[in-house]
Structure formats: C-alpha cells, structure tokens
C-alpha cells in the first residue's frame, strides 16, 4: 500500500511538472514606458492562458527590430507601422504588425524655465524634434496642424525640415533622437515629444503640452513579429493586449496620455 501511495504521489508530481513546463515562453522586447508596463499588466492573464512572458526592455528604436529579425525575440512592442516600414526598407528586415494596441499622441512642450504659450512663441525660437523619419514627420505635422509652419504638399509621411515650405517665424530646428528630446528641452525653447518618452522623463503629459498633433494622424503602436510567424501564442498575446482588462489598465494608468486603439 505504501509503495502504491508513493507511486501515485510520484506520478502526480510528474504530471504537475509536465503541466508547468507545458507553458509556452514568449520573449518580447519593449520600451520601458508605457510598453513594458502594459506587458507587465498582461503577464498574469497570459500565464492563465499557458504563456510565460519574458520582457526585455530597450532604450533605443534599433536593437528591438534587429534582435527580432535575428530570432532573439519572439515579438517587440515599441513602434508604429510607418516606422516599421521605414526600418524594413532601410535595413532589409522582414517584420510585420500582428496587431495594434495603443496610440501615443505627440505634444509640443515648453522649456520649464520659460513662459511660452502657443500664441506667444517668439520668432527665432529653437524647437527640438525627433530625427527619425516618421517621428520627425509627425512632429512637423503637429507644428503645421497648429499653424506654426507649412510643409511642402508632396512631403507626405517622410517630411523633414528640408520640406518646410513656409517658416514665417524663422524657427530653428534641432534634430535629436526621439528619446533625447525631453533631456534636450532645458537647452531649447520648445520640444515635440512622444508621450512615452515624456512619461519616462517624468513630464506631465496631460497638463504641460501647449499643442497636440491631430488625432487623425496619431499612429497606433503595434506588436511586431517576423513575417510568416503566425503562432497561436502570438495571436493570444495581441488578443490579451486588446482585451477589456488591458484597455482599462491603460485608461486608468495614463489618463489620456496613452490611448487604447480599441
């Protein structure tokens, strides 16, 4: 009898270990804020669905895509489709969107030491903007949307400062990495900042901006995967990130600075 009980216990433990090890592991690269925070909120939901999520945080826009292409990541979460498409074209990568999760509206922020409103921006003001193709275009689009400059009508989604057709206030543009714009703000008059980088820098993204980009051009941030990778666990990842639980987490945590696509 004792041997039978021991055998039964052994089989039960073996079965339990088998169940635990049956969970699929997903390694996802992400920017710290809000992407990694949103993934952390999704972790327990994914675990219930048999997926163990490992999050690797990056502080740049290049390595997450290179490591995904190389197979070191299963997916990444930090970018919008225009950036992804431009990256593919520039680097020969083969990455696609598996689904959209949220928007990060861009805002025009003022150097904290200066009292500047949208109507009182001085002529010759220095404005820091992101230097990557798609975010620079978005930043310039924000300035045009708010009547500060005019762009060449043929510039499209790849506009740079060279495509500024009218700059009546003679603004001086400083192009830096998107993540560096908040740190540059103290050295310029204004900066156009992605809300995720504003959040990381501790900037008040709800009350501080004096202008926002048009909601019609705010690009959704996506889960990127390798072309042809249609594993069910990746579909589940997207489904969870678009679920009511995560939508509520985003709304309650970021108060409009990050907006769910659903």
What does each model-found stretch correspond to?
Residues 23-33, 51-57, 126-127:
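Short, well-ordered beta-strand elements
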Residues 56-66, 155-183:
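Short helix-initiation/N-cap motifs at beta->coil->alpha
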Residues 61-92, 114, 198-202:
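Pocket-flanking alpha-helical
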Residues 69-79, 125, 148, 169-171, ...:
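Alpha-to-beta junction loops
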Residues 86-98, 111-115, 187, 192, ...:
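Ligand-binding "clamshell"
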Residues 98-149, 247:
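A conserved helix-loop-strand patch within extracytoplasmic ligand-binding domains
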Residues 100-110, 135-144, 199-239, 241-262:
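Periplasmic-binding protein-like
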């Amino acid at each position: 009898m004792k041997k039978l009980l021991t055998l039964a216990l052994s089989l039960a433990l073996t079965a339990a270990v088998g169940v635990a090890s049956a969970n699929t592991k997903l390694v996802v690269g992400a920017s710290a804020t809000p992407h990694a925070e949103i993934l952390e909120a999704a972790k327990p939901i994914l675990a219930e669905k048999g997926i163990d999520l490992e999050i690797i945080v990056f502080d740049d826009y290049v390595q997450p895509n290179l490591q995904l292409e190389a197979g070191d990541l299963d997916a990444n979460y930090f970018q919008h489709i225009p950036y992804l498409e431009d990256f593919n074209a520039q680097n020969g990568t083969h990455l696609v969107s598996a689904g959209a999760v949220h928007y990060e509206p861009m805002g025009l922020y003022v150097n904290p030491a200066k009292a500047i409103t949208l109507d009182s921006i001085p002529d010759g003001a220095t404005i820091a903007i992101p230097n990557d193709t798609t975010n620079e275009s978005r930043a310039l689009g924000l300035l045009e949307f708010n009547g500060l400059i005019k762009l060449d009508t043929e510039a499209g989604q790849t506009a740079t400062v060279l495509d500024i057709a009218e700059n009546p206030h003679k603004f001086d543009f400083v192009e830096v990495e998107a993540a560096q714009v908040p740190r540059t703000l103290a050295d310029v008059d204004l900066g156009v900042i992605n809300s995720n980088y504003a959040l990381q820098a501790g900037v008040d993204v709800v009350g501080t901006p004096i202008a926002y980009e048009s909601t019609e051009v705010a690009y959704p941030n996506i889960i990127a995967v390798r072309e042809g990778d249609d594993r069910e666990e990746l579909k589940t990842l997207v489904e969870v990130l678009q679920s009511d639980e995560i939508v509520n987490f985003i709304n309650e945590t970021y108060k409009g600075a990050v907006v769910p696509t659903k």
